[in-house]
């Protein structure tokens, strides 16, 4: 790898990238160019297990930075108002039994079980009881994630990075010097020049380096939201999950950390004005807390991705590379995917990452396949979802088609999609699975084994609040 790597931008994405490149290429000089004048947007506070995998790769134990980063544990997402009733999208338990014999899934489907995940994954029952699985030092990567305070996590990662020899240059980039169609240096407003062999664009929505090379931004027109009103509140909730609750023109997030709760309203300005959205969000927040509410910060965004994540001698990471609304907390996950895929140095890197982002986008679109009629926003969002190619294939199959996901390279599995199709009441629940890919017959002993496994996990779960406070 190149001798000198320059990261443009701090924040979680910037310092995470710096640590990643230093670990992957220990002989390289890594420099972060950061400006306190610009600051960070502070999104991406609900993560997925990919964040834990990244920390593990960087030799950072999440338990060691828990206090500094105001981290709280997360086992999934609670959806309120999206379907006929509240439902959960839990992470998968890291247990070989969760690679369920497909005959078991067939059994539950044929018996019209409306929530396969609730039956097959004990994390739902555990979460509903306000409990959590005990988390061990040798942490598995797919059964839990964390809620973070983006600013505090950025500071914690920065501290670790500086202790590992990563350099910091403070200042605002005024111009970019390009030679032979590659970035040669970043020129700060002070006149100081930061030279490098390879550059990582973590400049957020500004996309400084991507714009310098006129990299095309692919808009996701089947996702309608374009505005967010973030509002952290002091009240805390000992809930090991993110809550996504629908309002008239979008949805709200609730992300509890140790010392506060991140909340926000994601909506579309094409269906309501910002002042009306503030009033609606304010009314909702007053049902959650009685504290003073500040709704002055507004984030305008465009959903989509760069056509090329790696171009010339530049790699785009974080908001500089893409943006998807945070329904499943995939922002940092996609950044981790970009970094891991990049160090593999495959020729099809751009296409592989683009396909992964598109797959995740399709899954986010699936969330809007609702029967909500409270506004034109929800009617149009549902219409857009039904026009999505993957969703059309899922809905048009006479039987639920596992083969759509048989390459096993999807970030979200068939069961993830099935969970939403059923809970959003988008398909009949008396469906069965019948493909050449799965031929096993139902075995009653396997059903008993499944129930015993399910019960043992629920039985061994502990009170979340008590367990969490042991770490503080």
Question: At which residue positions do the language-model features occur?
Answer:
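Dinucleotide-binding Rossmann-like beta1-alpha1 core, especially the glycine-rich loop
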Residues: 39, 43-128
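N-terminal Rossmann-fold NAD(P) dinucleotide-binding loop
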Residues: 14
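Glycine-rich FAD pyrophosphate-binding loop
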Residues: 22-43
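Long, low-complexity C-terminal extensions of enzymes
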Residues: 73, 345-472
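Beta1/beta-strand and adjacent pyrophosphate-binding region of the FAD-binding site
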Residues: 2-11
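Conserved FAD/dinucleotide-binding core of flavoprotein oxidoreductases
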Residues: 247-300, 322-333
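Predominantly flavin-linked oxidoreductase catalytic cores and closely associated redox partners
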Residues: 139-277
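A conserved active-site cap/scaffold subdomain adjacent to cofactor or substrate pockets
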Residues: 266, 295-351
């Amino acid at each position: 790898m190149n001798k000198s790597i320059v990261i443009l931008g701090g924040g979680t994405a910037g310092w995470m990238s710096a640590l990643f490149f230093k670990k992957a290429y220990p002989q390289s000089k890594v420099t972060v160019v950061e400006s306190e004048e610009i600051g960070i947007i502070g999104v991406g506070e609900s993560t997925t297990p990919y964040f834990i995998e990244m920390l593990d790769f960087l030799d950072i134990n999440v338990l060691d930075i828990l206090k500094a980063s105001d981290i709280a544990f997360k086992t999934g997402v609670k959806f309120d108002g999206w379907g006929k009733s509240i439902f959960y999208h839990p992470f998968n338990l890291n247990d070989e039994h969760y690679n369920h014999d497909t005959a078991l899934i067939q059994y539950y489907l044929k018996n019209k079980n409306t929530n396969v995940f609730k039956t097959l994954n004990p994390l739902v029952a555990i979460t509903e009881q306000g409990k959590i699985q005990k988390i061990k030092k040798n942490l598995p990567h797919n059964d839990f994630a964390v809620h973070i305070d983006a600013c505090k996590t950025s500071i914690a990662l920065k501290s670790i990075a500086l202790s590992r020899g990563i350099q910091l240059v403070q200042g605002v980039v005024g111009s970019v010097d390009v030679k032979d169609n590659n970035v040669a240096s970043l020129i700060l407003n002070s006149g100081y020049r930061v030279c490098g062999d390879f550059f990582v664009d973590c400049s957020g929505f500004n996309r400084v380096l991507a714009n310098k090379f006129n990299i095309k931004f692919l808009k996701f027109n089947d996702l309608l939201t374009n505005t967010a009103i973030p509002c952290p509140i002091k009240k805390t909730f000992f809930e090991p999950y993110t809550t996504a609750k629908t309002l008239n023109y979008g949805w709200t997030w609730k992300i509890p950390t140790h010392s506060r709760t991140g909340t926000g309203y994601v909506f579309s300005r094409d269906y309501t004005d910002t002042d009306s959205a503030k009033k609606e969000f304010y009314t909702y927040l007053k049902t959650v807390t009685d504290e003073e509410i500040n709704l002055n910060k507004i984030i305008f965004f465009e959903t989509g991705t760069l056509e090329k994540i790696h171009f010339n001698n530049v790699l785009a990471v974080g908001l500089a590379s893409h943006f998807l609304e945070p329904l499943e907390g995939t922002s940092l996950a996609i950044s981790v995917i970009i970094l891991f895929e990049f160090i593999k140095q495959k020729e099809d890197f751009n296409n592989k990452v683009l396909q992964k982002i598109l797959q995740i986008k399709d899954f986010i679109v699936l969330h809007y396949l609702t029967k909500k009629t409270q506004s034109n926003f929800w009617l149009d969002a549902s219409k857009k979802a039904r026009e999505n190619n993957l969703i059309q294939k899922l809905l048009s199959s006479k039987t639920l088609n596992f083969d759509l996901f048989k390459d096993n390279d999807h970030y979200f599995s068939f069961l993830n999609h099935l969970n939403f199709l059923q809970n959003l009441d988008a398909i009949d629940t008396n469906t069965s699975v019948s493909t050449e890919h799965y031929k096993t017959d139902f075995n009653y002993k396997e059903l008993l084994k499944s129930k015993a496994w399910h019960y043992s996990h629920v039985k061994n779960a502990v009170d979340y609040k008590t367990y969490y406070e042991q770490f503080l």
